[in-house]
Amino acid sequence: MKMTGKKIISAALLIVFAGLLFAESEDEMKKRILKNADLSGESASDLMAADDGEDKYANSKNAPKRLPSEFPRDVPYTKAGIDFCEAHYGHKIFNEEGRKRYYEASVKAAEEMTDEYSKLITLARADYYYGLSIMESFDLTSLDNMDLGDTKTTESINDRAGAYFDKAIDECNQALKIKKGSDGYSTLAQAISMNCTAKNVSYVLANGLKVRANAKKAVALDYSNGLGQFMVIAQDAYAPWPFCKLKSSRKALLRVLDDKYIRIERFDYQMIYAAIGYTFYKQKKWDKAIEWYNKILELYPQNFAARQMIKKIQDRKAGKKN
């Protein structure tokens, strides 16, 4: 079997991490990674304490609860932005020309805005979805992405996508200097999260903890921010062992789906469904996993990631290696 560069690196990383797991306890590993992480002012001890139990998801309990219709988001999606999201998740972008067409329309809509904060966040969304379209993959950390070697994420694709995620992060940081807004923090969390897929392990160790930290800020400002709520929880669903918390993260995601005070866009639903499906996948509960990935196909019948995961699960049920 021919080994690609990515698979060789992944195999080497698995060996390294396996050695570390035998050499130290879970708490010791967490402390080591927190020590090496760039937390940008976040307290490592606070993050360690918040990492146990479901209370870490209750970061927004003091935020005002209002129905989404009564509390509009600080940067509404433009029509062009929604079209880009829908085209990506609906698998309607088949080539670079189509990708650029949606991207340029989104950028044009942003440049027509007079409010600088809104303009920057809208540009960040355009850059994020451009990078995401290039990768056509799940929101997984680079470490956990090791077992998805059949995805289209080659090193060259990662580099291209990562440049757009970098751009989105810069735009969010510029916007947040103007205004501490909920959509700014949730968009930043989302961009960092996908950059953890595109970049190397050192990037994950330095920046991974910023995802939840920024998502918590988003939800503290606007409890109804569905993306923010999702990003607070998502790392526990997608993180590699021993950091994943499959049952508690799934319970928290189901709670988000049931909360009438949380605004969930159509394209946010597919992210939540995918994360719930992934928790069942990691537990080898194949039928339950397929059930949730099928929910994505009810929204987006041609969704690439859901179809890919269903095929992967069906192959594993049949005893095939993939």
What are these regions (language model features)?
Residues 2-10:
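Bacterial N-terminal signal peptides that target proteins for export
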Residues 11-19:
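Bacterial N-terminal signal peptides
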Residues 183, 226-227, 259-268, 299-310:
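Boundary/linker segments of alpha-helical solenoid repeat arrays
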